[in-house]
Curated annotation (Swiss-Prot):
It comes from Thermothelomyces thermophilus (Myceliophthora thermophila). The keyword Transmembrane does not apply. This is Acetylesterase. Residues 1-21 form the signal peptide. The gene is aes1. Its EC number is 3.1.1.6.
Amino acid sequence: MGRFLTTTALALLATGGAATARPIRACDVSTKYLITFGDSYSQTGFDVTGTKPSASNPLGNPLLPGWTASGGLNWVGFLVSEFNTSTTLSYNFAYGGATTNATIVPPYQPTVLSFIDQVAQFSGSIARKPDYAPWNADNALFGVWIGVNDVGNVWWDPNYDSLLEQIMESYFGQLQILYDAGARNFVLLSVPPIQRTPAVLLNNSPENQKAEALAVDKYNEALAANLEAFTDKNGGITAKIVDTGVPFNTALDNPTDYGAPDATCYNSDGKSCLWFNDYHPGIEINRLVAQAVADAWKGSFF
């Protein structure tokens, strides 16, 4: 039986402080691997066939901060450049617009790579632990942050509960593939309070906002329940859920503490408002999310 923990404790959130990272140095035995999957909240534009991550270039391609939807670094970039305590290399398969399974919840374009497609990319590349990415069960942390588009695209559907069961079956089917490839450390990020995005607040009635919030809660409850079953089934796992609602709400409830005039403005500079656009968090919220992940794995990966 594996270890399953849910973490909401964010010791540094009150000040928004960042952990001090050791300088990135040449690859050595302490090198760690952050292997991630998700949607635009996680994407950095990485192409596994391009320049590979290295000690001096932890994202590989594009260079830091990558091609993100935050206006700068997102949570992945922060983890490998500011919260790392040793060389940490990012293999980020996340793709903007992704859903878990495109046959259950279609993405906005058919060319979008779903979580299933992303895991297939992993399986066809670094799953075999090539010389350029010699990850193993101890030095690799697998991160998944998906569900924003799953919930956002179908929260209103009268068959939402049934769809959610199908989504979770697909989600944990992909985790099983990763486990079978040797993954043992998993961090799953919950769906944040998307009902607080400017897009939802401006375009939905209070009743619909409450309904979407309920759909988010149902998703996150299902995520926790399915992870517990997954760790019971598979041995040697350390798995943690990071409740992204905590960093989001911390910033949104205290916008001026994070350099924004209010909780609903957005700006593509990613800095002067909490939101990059009307649906994507800017740099400060991403920093807080990264901090939450780092705190959850303090002493082992960060």
